[in-house]
């Protein structure tokens, strides 16, 4: 397990915290509904995916009444609302590999919108499996840096069954096998509380450093448009902004 990353965690991912709450809540509710419908129980202790979804909802301050409504809706036999999990893969400008995970009630609509976004911003939407070999599929659990010392979080990650941990100036990020993700998440949640973020995702094997401001802005625009789509849950890419470019963009 590695203790510290060589670079600051400066990969620019405009996540849920940068979106309007309505869009954040839409994505969270979809995940709750899907977790209930695909799980064996609507009791979080017996449904790890639901527990994770509820943790995410609470960390984003989704009102309790909306959480309860989503769970009740998913349990209503007369409610035919359902979402299909689907993955899209392609290349953004300058050869950046992109993986998109979506929950959709209309695959044709989502595919059309994702393809349109790629085309508009200079990317190419490929077939499923066209870029995933450039990533590791694993669990990710992130805590703020002040939750524990590097040594303590390192030991906790090992005990939880984590494979790797990276600590930088801002966060501790623990990586797990997919099979061990929910067990590790439960252990760490019991020890440190709800994490800032947790998910099964795609982590690049190698990253492409972007040190040109205009190239970075073009890429980030595509990422932003994709993440604004209600059907898109997460976007992953094998890129990292150089510190200089990151700071310039942050100042604009």
Curated annotation (Swiss-Prot):
* Family matches, as Gene3D superfamilies: 1.10.10.200, 3.30.70.980
- Give its localization: Cytoplasm
Offer a single GO CC term for the protein.
Answer: cytoplasm
Gene Ontology biological process terms in this record:
regulation of DNA-templated transcription
Keyword terms of this UniProt record: Cytoplasm, DNA-binding, Transcription, Transcription regulation
What's the chief localization of this chain?
Answer: cytoplasm
* Pfam families registered for this protein in UniProt: TACO1_YebC_N (PF20772), Transcrip_reg (PF01709)
Q: Which residues cross the membrane?
A: none
Q: Which GO terms describe its molecular function?
A: DNA binding
Stretches the record annotates as Disordered: 1-22
Q: Does the record carry Acyltransferase as a key word? A: no
Q: Does the keyword Transcription regulation apply?
A: yes
Family that this chain belongs to: Belongs to the TACO1 family.
Q: Which PANTHER family match?
A: PTHR12532:SF11, TRANSLATIONAL ACTIVATOR OF CYTOCHROME C OXIDASE 1 (PTHR12532)
HAMAP family (UniProt xref): Transcrip_reg_TACO1 (MF_00693)
Q: What is this protein called?
A: Probable transcriptional regulatory protein RT0442
Q: What organism is the protein native to?
A: Rickettsia typhi (strain ATCC VR-144 / Wilmington)
């Amino acid at each position: 397990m590695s203790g510290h990353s060589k670079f600051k965690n400066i990969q620019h991912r405009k996540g849920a915290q940068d979106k309007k709450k309505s869009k954040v809540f839409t994505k969270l509710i979809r995940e709750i509904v899907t977790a209930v419908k695909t799980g064996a129980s609507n009791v979080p202790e017996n449904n790890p995916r639901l527990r994770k979804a509820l943790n995410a909802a609470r960390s984003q301050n989704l009102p309790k009444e909306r959480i309860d409504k989503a769970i009740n809706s998913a349990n209503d036999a007369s409610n035919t609302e359902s979402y299909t999990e689907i993955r899209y893969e392609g290349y953004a400008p300058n050869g950046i590999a992109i993986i998109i995970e979506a929950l959709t009630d209309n695959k044709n609509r989502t595919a059309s919108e994702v393809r349109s976004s790629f085309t508009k911003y200079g990317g190419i939407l490929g077939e499923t499996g066209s870029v995933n070999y450039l990533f590791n599929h694993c669990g990710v659990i992130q805590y703020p840096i002040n939750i524990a010392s590097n040594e303590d979080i390192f030991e906790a990650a090992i005990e939880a069954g984590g494979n790797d941990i990276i600590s930088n100036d801002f966060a501790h990020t623990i990586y797990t096998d997919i099979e061990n993700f929910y067990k590790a998440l439960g252990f760490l949640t019991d020890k440190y509380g709800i994490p800032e973020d947790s998910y099964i995702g795609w982590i690049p094997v190698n990253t492409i450093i972007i040190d040109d401001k205009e190239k970075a802005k073009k890429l980030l625009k595509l990422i932003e448009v994709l993440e604004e789509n209600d059907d898109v849950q997460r976007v992953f890419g094998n890129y990292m902004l150089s510190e200089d470019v990151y700071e310039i963009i942050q100042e604009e």
